[in-house]
Amino acid sequence: MEIGKKYELNPHRIKSFIDISSSNASMVGIIQENGGWFEVKSISSLDGFDYVTEIICANGEIYNDDGMGDDYFELSEEEFYCFREYKEPTSEEDEVKDKVSGVTKIHCIVDENNVDEIIELLRKTFKK
């Protein structure tokens, strides 16, 4: 992770992240309840390992390793694999592609006059 970059949880790694430490469940809550992503504001090094020690969430809330209880936030280098860099969607179509791999979005109006054409269009689109 790098200062100034934005990250989000990798949906396939949330359970792994929570299993690493009991405090990680509250950090998942922090991320999800505050916009779904965060920007790294501070990194500290200790014994050759990097730790994210302060973040600012999508909604502007700041969390750090000085927080107590549910406000505590610290990520060790060994946990970074549970996250991925956040890309801001540039359009609704980009947002859909980011969330579900392989999705094709088609806008169409179907009625009894064009149903066969639409079915053929769908076949051509998805049976490549």
UniProtKB/Swiss-Prot annotation:
* Tree of life domain: Viruses
Question: Which protein, by its recorded name, is this?
Answer: Uncharacterized 14.7 kDa protein in frd-Gp32 intergenic region
The record lists the lineage as: Viruses, Duplodnaviria, Heunggongvirae, Uroviricota, Caudoviricetes
